[in-house]
């Protein structure tokens, strides 16, 4: 059930590889050990001119990738740390960005607050 939003900051002349969303979904699904069709990835592109860091300019190789994860329950402690490390590594490899440019955020647990097909996630 994980839903993962990947927001890729791209330069003006950057071309996104065909199939990038599927490659990300496959890699993220393997990271979460999800059965086929159970991890959903939504890929969003953010133009470089719509992203900034205060008092700083970035080289194209430094453009970030923002990742937001929604799961039934959020892991804790070492399990969360390990999952973030694996997820950042997988996304870095697929996008060609350094792992230091991949930033992962976990949303609050979906249990009890999200519905699929009219059914509350328990």
Regions found by a protein language model. Name each.
Residues 1-122:
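Interaction-mediating elements
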